Amino acid sequence: MSTQDRPSGSGQDPQDRLTHIDEAGAARMVDVSGKDVTARTARASGRVLVAPRVVELLRGEGVPKGDALATARIAGIMGAKRTPDLIPLCHPLSVSGVKLDLSVADDAVEITATVRTTDRTGVEMEALTAVSVAALTVVDMVKAVDKGAVITDVRVEQKTGGKSGDWTRS
């Protein structure tokens, strides 16, 4: 596992602490009222590993339930908008835009979500939720053909804006 793929931080630096845990160890929603409203973006990606027959169907006649990629795209967009309903301490944000790209590779459906906002906190969770919900939808759409589809590699690829600045996975 590379440094970019695992959690980091020693816990000694105040920047290394878990912001959603208070001094007593209780969960809390971070107060972002003092932060500046800035333009922010986040891009996340993930894959759904599928059987060769699923790849063949997605590239051709489609799967029995219908247009899997279009359905997953809409589901991912809806997921991004519903993130604070799914993740308890996530702030409701004014999501400005969600772009979801799905492509069929030789062994997988590859998913990338880019989410934009102008707000006080970032949209990494919205991008991750978009990818996750799209991936779950792909699994649902192909399960009649491939009960062994696997969701994998869901992760933030990039974030821009905010106090902590820009970050890109290397």
UniProtKB/Swiss-Prot annotation:
Alphabetized HAMAP family for the sequence: MoaC_B
Cited InterPro entries: MoaC, MoaC_bact/euk, MoaC_sf, MoCo_biosynth_MoaA/MoaC, Mopterin_CF_biosynth-C_dom
Stated name of the protein: Cyclic pyranopterin monophosphate synthase
GO molecular function: cyclic pyranopterin monophosphate synthase activity
EC number: 4.6.1.17
Pfam families tied to this protein: MoaC (PF01967)
Organism of provenance: Streptomyces coelicolor (strain ATCC BAA-471 / A3(2) / M145)
Pathway named in the protein's UniProt entry: Cofactor biosynthesis; molybdopterin biosynthesis
Record keywords: Lyase, Molybdenum cofactor biosynthesis
Primary enzyme class: lyase
PANTHER family, alphabetized: CYCLIC PYRANOPTERIN MONOPHOSPHATE SYNTHASE (PTHR22960:SF29), MOLYBDOPTERIN COFACTOR SYNTHESIS PROTEIN A (PTHR22960)
